[in-house]
Design a protein with these regions (language model features):
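Noncatalytic, basic helical substrate-engagement surface that gates or grips nucleic-acid strands
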Residues: 1-138, 144-161, 254, 259-274
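Non-catalytic nucleic-acid-binding/docking modules located in mid-to-C-terminal regions
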Residues: 41-52, 67-75, 80-81, 107-110, ...
C-alpha cells in the first residue's frame, strides 16, 4: 500500500474535530490514524509506504512553469476553535504533520521524504521498482491514474472508490497509458495549470479515440493530426495555438519517467530493500498519552502492524 502522505493528512486535518489535553486541535493526528486503520483493514497490506513532498520539491516543475501551484489557499480548519488565530492554526497544523511523521517512525512503515522530490515522483519510482507486486496507491489525486496497470490500483478516499485499468477506460474512454497526455491538453486547475481553451477530457476522448488504446500515443501525433485536419474546428485551432503550453503541461504532469537523479532512485530502492520492521509500541503509547490520542481504539491497527512487523523481520533475515 502506497500512501500520498499530505493528501491523507490534510483530509484528516480538515475533517476530524479532536482536541488534545491543552485544547489544541489534534484531528490531523487522530484522523490520519483512523484512516490508516480503515485502509489497512480493507487492503490487508504486507508493506506500507508513506510518501511526502520533500523540501523544495516544486523547484523542477516551477522551472518549467513559474505559476505551478501558485495561488493555492492554505489548508484551513473548517470550524472555529475559540481564539485560535490564523498564525496559531498554521503552527498547530505543522506540529500535527510533524507529529504524524514521528508516530510513523515508531511503526513498521516506510516513509519517503527526499529533498527536491515531490511525493508524486516518489510514488512513480516505487511503482516502477515493484512492477510485479500488487499495490494500491491511496490518494484523491487523479494524476496517479497514469500509473495504473494489471498490478497497480488507485483508491480515492473522497469517493471511496478504487480505479483499475478497466474502470478508467469505462469512465473516461482513455487508457491509463495515455491519461497524462490527455490531461496535458485539458490542464489541471488544482496545480494552476491552464489547458487549451475549450478542451476537456470528453472532447479529447471523442476526437482522438486512439487514446483508449493501451499503445502509447505521442504528443506530436495529436498535434500533427490537428495540423493535417482538412476542415479544422475551433477545437483543433485551440490546440495548435496552445502547443507550447500543452507540451509544458505534459512535462510536468507525466510520471512515467520522472526527472530524478540516479542517487534519488537508489535512495528509494534502498528504502524498499531495507523495509523497517521495528514496532515500538512503548514509545507510541507515550506519545498517545502526551497528545490525548489514546482514546482512539488502536487495537486493530496495532494487530495488523504487528503482523507486518513480524513478516518483515522474517524477510529481512532471509
Amino acid at each position: 500500500m502506497i500512501i500520498d502522505g499530505l493528501n491523507l493528512f490534510f483530509r484528516a486535518y480538515m475533517m476530524d474535530p479532536s482536541l488534545g489535553p491543552n485544547g489544541q486541535p489534534t484531528g490531523g493526528i487522530k484522523g490520519a490514524f483512523k484512516m490508516l486503520q480503515k485502509l489497512v483493514r480493507e487492503n490487508n497490506p504486507d508493506k506500507i509506504f508513506f510518501c511526502w513532498d520533500g523540501p523544495k520539491s516544486s523547484i523542477r516543475r516551477r522551472a518549467i512553469n513559474s505559476n505551478y501551484k501558485e495561488g493555492r489557499k492554505p489548508v484551513r480548519l473548517n470550524r472555529n476553535f475559540g481564539d485560535l488565530t490564523e498564525e496559531d492554526e498554521k503552527k498547530n497544523r505543522y506540529w500535527q504533520y510533524a507529529r504524524v511523521v514521528e508516530y510513523l517512525n515508531e511503526m513498521p512503515i516506510a516513509q519517503i521524504y527526499i529533498d527536491f522530490v515531490e511525493a508524486d515522483d516518489a510514488i512513480s519510482v516505487l511503482c516502477r521498482e515493484l512492477p510485479n507486486v500488487k499495490k494500491t496507491i491511496i490518494s484523491n489525486d487523479k494524476d496517479f491514474i497514469q500509473l495504473l496497470d494489471a498490478n497497480t490500483f488507485l483508491y480515492r478516499p473522497c469517493k471511496e472508490e478504487t480505479y483499475d485499468v478497466e474502470k478508467v477506460i469505462n469512465e473516461f474512454n482513455i487508457h491509463p497509458t495515455n491519461f497524462a497526455l490527455a490531461r496535458a491538453f485539458v490542464g489541471d486547475a488544482s496545480d494552476n495549470l491552464p489547458g487549451a481553451k475549450g478542451v476537456g477530457l470528453k472532447t479529447m476522448a471523442k476526437r482522438f479515440p486512439e487514446l483508449k488504446e493501451e499503445k502509447t500515443i505521442l504528443l506530436t501525433e495529436i498535434i500533427d493530426s490537428c495540423k493535417n485536419e482538412a476542415k479544422p474546428l475551433a477545437f483543433h485551432n485551440s490546440i495548435l495555438e496552445s502547443e507550447k503550453l500543452i507540451k509544458d503541461n505534459y512535462d510536468m504532469m507525466q510520471l512515467y519517467a520522472p526527472s530524478l537523479s540516479i542517487g534519488v532512485r537508489e535512495k528509494i530502492r534502498d528504502i524498499i530493500d531495507n523495509y523497517p520492521a521495528s514496532f515500538n509500541k512503548t514509545n507510541l503509547r507515550k506519545m498517545m498519552l502526551e497528545d490525548g490520542t489514546g482514546n482512539f481504539s488502536w487495537t486493530e491497527l496495532f494487530a495488523n502492524l504487528n503482523m507486518i512487523s513480524i513478516t518483515s523481520k522474517v524477510k529481512n533475515e532471509q
